[in-house]
């Protein structure tokens, strides 16, 4: 968080494993750890402060948050890039989204958005389906770009967008459709173009399929559920790619 918007008076920075202090007793608690550490963070947070947790991770957190009675917790979709510690972040502004792509929802969304704006960064305060749609687009972005990049030797995001655009488009299209059906939303036309534009902003990013449970695993679970019900795999390209990379041992079968 400090790398994104800097520190302000009253901020307390905690390292991994450090307990959440009694003071300050109010205000947002920004959680910028790895997804696999989230359960420990929640368990270690005083119950009366859990509603103040602000989750800033990639991936679909919905089921996890619901399990922890935090379905209404503040969440953030970060479209930012920090090349290295101490450098100013690159904002997620593209030619198609001049107002930026970063978004937040929940109790502390407006506070977070104001903080970013004070640091010269953009942030949208969204709610309901508007946030769900933005969340799906971000999830498709990371899952599709990372998969296509890994399938082509771990190339950069920029190389994926420039040299493998048609392969990327096909994966994005099927993941968007599967996600829309699962979440009951409809993305605005031009999703691929928006995601490709952001890829050009962070062209230097490396690619790899990581944190499977939180990222590509969400789409693979949709595949498994469909096949179990005797339906066609809604994400065949995604499934084939995961199999080729050895992320899943075998393609699912009815």
Give residue ranges: language-model regions.
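Rossmann-like NAD(P)(H) cofactor-binding subdomain of soluble oxidoreductases
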Residues: 1-94
């Amino acid at each position: 968080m400090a790398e994104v918007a800097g520190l302000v008076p009253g901020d307390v920075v905690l390292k991994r494993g450090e307990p959440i202090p009694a003071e300050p007793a109010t205000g947002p608690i920004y959680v910028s750890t790895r997804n696999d550490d989230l359960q420990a963070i929640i368990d270690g947070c005083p119950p009366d402060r859990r509603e103040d947790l602000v989750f800033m991770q990639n991936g679909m957190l919905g089921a996890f948050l619901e399990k922890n009675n935090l379905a209404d917790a503040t969440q953030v979709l970060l479209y930012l890039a920090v090349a290295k510690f101490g450098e100013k972040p690159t904002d997620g502004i593209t030619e198609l989204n001049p107002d930026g792509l970063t978004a937040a929802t929940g109790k502390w969304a407006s506070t977070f958005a104001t903080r970013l704006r004070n640091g010269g960064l953009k942030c949208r305060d969204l709610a309901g389906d508007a946030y769900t749609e933005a969340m799906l687009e971000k999830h498709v972005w990371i899952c599709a770009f990372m998969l296509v990049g890994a399938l082509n030797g771990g190339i950069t995001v920029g190389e994926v967008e420039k040299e493998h655009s048609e392969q990327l488009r096909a994966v994005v299209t099927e993941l968007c459709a599967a996600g829309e059906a699962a979440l009951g939303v409809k993305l605005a036309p031009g999703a691929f173009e928006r995601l490709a534009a952001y890829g050009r902003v962070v062209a230097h990013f490396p690619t790899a399929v990581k944190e499977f449970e939180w990222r590509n695993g969400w789409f693979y679970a949709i595949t498994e559920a469909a096949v179990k019900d005797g339906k066609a795999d809604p994400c065949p390209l995604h499934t084939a790619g995961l199999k080729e990379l050895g992320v899943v041992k075998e393609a699912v079968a009815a």
